[in-house]
């Protein structure tokens, strides 16, 4: 499986310290960068869906608006802008909604 290309970095990634998985695809990441930075670097802008099925993406980039919610390692509703990447991390976009069967 080949790595997703980071075509949208502001500066080229000088050193990839790890690999994480975005929607099942591996991508290089650097220590200290956020999940949102990696998502932006590979061009993933649609991160979630609202109650009306409309796509949404990151808005504030600092954890206030909660528009960048993704599932990380199976845990829903994690803020991509506030989460630092870890080796082997698994990120799923547009999967932050609870299914009816999962509701308490």
Curated annotation (Swiss-Prot):
Its activity is regulated as follows:
Oxygen is necessary for cyanogenesis. Activated by succinate, glycine methyl ester, glucose and D,L-methionine in addition to glycine. Phenazine methosulfate, methylene blue, 2,6-dichlorophenolindophenol (DCIP) and ferricyanide can replace oxygen for the reaction. Inhibited by pyrrolnitrin and acriflavine at 1 mM concentration.
Q: What's its EC?
A: 1.4.99.5
Cellular localisation: Cell membrane
> Pfam families attached here?
Fer2_4
The family database entries (CDD domains) matched by this protein are listed as:
fer2
GO MF annotations in UniProt = 2 iron, 2 sulfur cluster binding; glycine dehydrogenase (cyanide-forming) activity; metal ion binding
Sequence positions that bind [2Fe-2S] cluster: 60, 65, 68, 81
pH dependency: Optimum pH is 8.3 (in the presence of Tris-HCl). Active from 7.3-7.8 in the presence of other buffers.
State how activity varies with temperature: Not stable at 0 degrees Celsius. Decrease in activity up to 40% immediately after freeze-drying procedure, with a further decrease up to 10% when stored at -10 degrees Celsius.
What triggers expression? Reduced oxygen levels.
Query: What are the annotated GO cellular component locations?
Result: plasma membrane
User: What keywords are annotated for this sequence in UniProt?
Assistant: 2Fe-2S, Cell membrane, Iron, Iron-sulfur, Membrane, Metal-binding, Oxidoreductase
What is the protein's known function?
Answer: A three-component membrane-bound flavoenzyme that catalyzes the formation of hydrogen cyanide, a secondary metabolite, by transfer of electrons to a cyanide-resistant branch of the aerobic respiratory chain.
Q: How does it assemble?
A: Heterotrimer of HcnA, HcnB and HcnC.
From the Swiss-Prot or TrEMBL record, give the protein name.
Hydrogen cyanide synthase subunit HcnA
Q: What is the lineage of its organism?
A: Bacteria, Pseudomonadati, Pseudomonadota, Gammaproteobacteria, Pseudomonadales
């Amino acid at each position: 499986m080949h790595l997703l290309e980071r075509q949208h970095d502001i500066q080229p990634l000088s050193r990839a310290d790890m690999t994480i998985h975005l929607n099942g695809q591996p991508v290089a990441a650097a220590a200290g960068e956020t999940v949102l930075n990696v998502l932006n670097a590979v061009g993933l802008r649609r991160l979630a869906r609202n109650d009306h099925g409309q796509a949404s993406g990151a808005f504030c980039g600092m954890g206030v608006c909660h528009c960048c919610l993704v599932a990380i390692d199976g845990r829903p509703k994690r803020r991509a802008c506030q989460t630092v990447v870890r080796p082997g991390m698994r990120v799923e976009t547009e999967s932050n909604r609870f299914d009816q069967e999962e509701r308490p």
